[in-house]
């Protein structure tokens, strides 16, 4: 199977209909409007990322004019064939010498089942997800390619002795969403000038993918020596698919396939990458420690909802107080090419504990027209939301722990943790809606209304949290102190001169 020629992309019509498996030419050369259709959101994100990376190497626009033209107009079949011709040999999943995302000649005592390529399907945290039984039993070529790419670039490594991708084990991936799959893919392909800016030393890098020019064992690799093709399709693990079985239904996408893969070989392999490779699909955090600049890609490290990270995802921040961030290059490109357009942002990834997946994350966040110019308003909305969360948590922490030096007994129950989860759940109905609809140039009234709603939410959650203990004689003083703490913090969150409740 060749990813540039054969049918492997699972889609359904944008307005509903049956799942179909199409090829890359059908995607690029037709006005049919498709959306990806896989049973798992992380596999859909991985499929999109794979399509974007393929698009980045075969079809980067030469300038903004060509970029806009390609969004609006499908390629002709001749144009498409010319674009893929130099790359065809690189994308055979079952190539005799250099199969896609694999290493030939892997030595392993046991065959690893395909479910190990599907993040979170097997292992101790499987119960945290809704997984169909047998989902990793036998995968078609398309789902196998998607899973290989996902494991290498967007999921944690296999554990001890195996490396994760260039962005770390659980990077946050961000993409601009278009009206359909074709436009979404093309919106996230950097133009040639932006690609050259992202990778200024490209002519001095190694740019063959790892399955054609393998990484050497124990090699020390400067990140700056990795070309954009090699980096986008980085494979840190030694994996080799076993021979496929015959025709049948793919256990992942559910479609009939002539060949299905049931297992693979893997072996431990180590090397070191020095520095940060400038991946165009992820926001980057910058910190200064002891005068040294440290960079790392944004990751989901807590269960806090995606809105808490928005200011890091769409607003560049120069280093202040030893912290800063850069948004993903694909988001910055859209900001510059479409300065008056609203933004639909796909944001996804995993939260993990070492090699175990704790949570899959996949959100679409909407930003009204004006988001490009009003990063300060976006920052304020996020800061307001986090401020009220902190006020509630501090007050309930006081109630839970008490004050030993003042002889106030605590409830001894982590009500602050439970209330924080409820706050986040409720805030996901409020804050994303504000960002999607706010008139950024006249945001004061909307932010004031948000403050009022969050104030009321804090009061409600505080009262719900303490209600079971309200009549406990030894907690009456502690409750009064905790309530006073809540209103103290809520008053501090009011703008100067604003009214206060309590």
From Swiss-Prot:
Record keyword RNA-binding present: yes
Record keywords: Antiviral defense, DNA-binding, RNA-binding
Keyword DNA repair among record annotations: no
Consequences of knocking out this gene: Loss of resistance to bacteriophage lambda infection, loss of plasmid silencing.
GO terms (BP aspect): CRISPR-cas system; defense response to virus
UniProt xrefs under Pfam families: CRISPR_Cse1 (PF09481)
UniProt GO cellular component terms: protein-containing complex
InterPro entries given in the database record: CRISPR-assoc_prot_Cse1 (IPR013381)
Molecular function via GO: DNA binding; RNA binding; zinc ion binding
Induction: Repressed by H-NS, activated by LeuO. Activated by the BaeSR two-component regulatory system, possibly due to envelope stress. Part of the casABCDE-ygbT-ygbF operon.
Role, per record: CRISPR (clustered regularly interspaced short palindromic repeat), is an adaptive immune system that provides protection against mobile genetic elements (viruses, transposable elements and conjugative plasmids). CRISPR clusters contain sequences complementary to antecedent mobile elements and target invading nucleic acids. CRISPR clusters are transcribed and processed into CRISPR RNA (crRNA). A component of Cascade, which participates in CRISPR interference, the third stage of CRISPR immunity. Cascade binds both crRNA and in a sequence-specific manner negatively supercoiled dsDNA target. This leads to the formation of an R-loop in which the crRNA binds the target DNA, displacing the noncomplementary strand. Cas3 is recruited to Cascade, probably via interactions with CasA, nicks target DNA and then unwinds and cleaves the target, leading to DNA degradation and invader neutralization.
Similarity annotation: Belongs to the CRISPR associated protein CasA/Cse1 family. Type I-E/Ecoli subfamily.
NCBIfam families: casA_cse1, PRK09693.1
Quaternary structure annotation from Swiss-Prot or TrEMBL: Part of the Cascade ribonucleoprotein complex, with stoichiometry CasA(1),CasB(2),CasC(6),CasD(1),CasE(1)-crRNA(1). Interacts directly with the 5' end of crRNA, CasB, CasD and CasE. Binding of target ssRNA or dsDNA causes a conformational change in the Cascade complex; CasA is required for high affinity target DNA binding. Interacts with Cas3 once Cascade has recognized target DNA.
Protein name as it appears in the record: CRISPR system Cascade subunit CasA
Species, as recorded: Escherichia coli (strain K12)
Taxonomic path: Bacteria, Pseudomonadati, Pseudomonadota, Gammaproteobacteria, Enterobacterales
